Amino acid sequence: MVQRFQPATLSLEELPPIDYIVISHDHYDHLDMRSVQFFRDKEATFLVPLGIKSHLEYWGVASKNIVELDWWADHEFEGIRFVCTPAQHFSGRTGTNQTTLWASWIVDSPNSKIYFSGDSGYDEHYQKIGDQLGPFDAAFIDSGQYNERWREVHNLPEEAVQAAIDLRAKQMIPIHWAMFELSLHDWDEPIKRSQQAAEELGMELMTPKLGQVVDLSLKNQFSHWWEQVQ
């Protein structure tokens, strides 16, 4: 199995109470059985794309705690609206079983509107989402583990920044770059390229340390912490 760059900042047991969990797709680095079963026992609600409900039910999650949605469908809990939106990726727990949907998500609350890309290559879906459902206070966008040969399923860093612009996001948080090594680039190349592209295109980049708590309502200042990693 692929190893993490470093141990998790917090254990599952140290996390605060979690009410809702969105799942982008069923690849192993995005859908972990042990984590699902931990939150199953906490009665968390899972929001998943089509086909993934069967995984969760097999792992013992009650049907009442699963909301399965197609692209552009939404569901509301306690004033928080969750929208399942398109992504450009693929799925499957094995190399041949690709019968489940992949997705990005919007979490729209009275306090903020957040976009989460899941895994995705760059395409016109970002512009469509921005036009129909934007703007966003912050966008978490796939910015790592890319390669020119598979750019259709993982954004290049420059494309990720352009995606944030297409989405009409006020701020972008690069994700999918500092946990697992799944490509051939240096571990910090994604953030360096994202930083340069953001400066050139005028996008505000948020680069918190792993585990750092961020208040989106504040003007946050972030160090280039990756430059200090040996």
Residue ranges: model-predicted function:
Residues M1-D26, M33-Q37, V48-G51, G92, ...:
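Pre-active-site segment of Zn-dependent metallo-hydrolases
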Residues T9-E13, E57, E76, T96, ...:
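A general structural signal for stabilizing positions within well-ordered secondary structure
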Residues L218-Q230:
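A short C-terminal boundary segment appended to hydrolase-like catalytic domains
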Residues V48-S112, R193-V213, S217-N220:
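Metallo-beta-lactamase
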Residues D32-D41, S183-K192, S217-L218:
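Metal-dependent catalytic neighborhoods of phosphoester/phosphodiester hydrolases
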Residues E13-P16, D41, K64, I80, ...:
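Structured loop/turn residues at beta-strand edges in well-structured enzyme cores
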Residues R4, Y20, T45, G51-S54, ...:
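Cap/insert and terminal regions of metallo-dependent hydrolase folds
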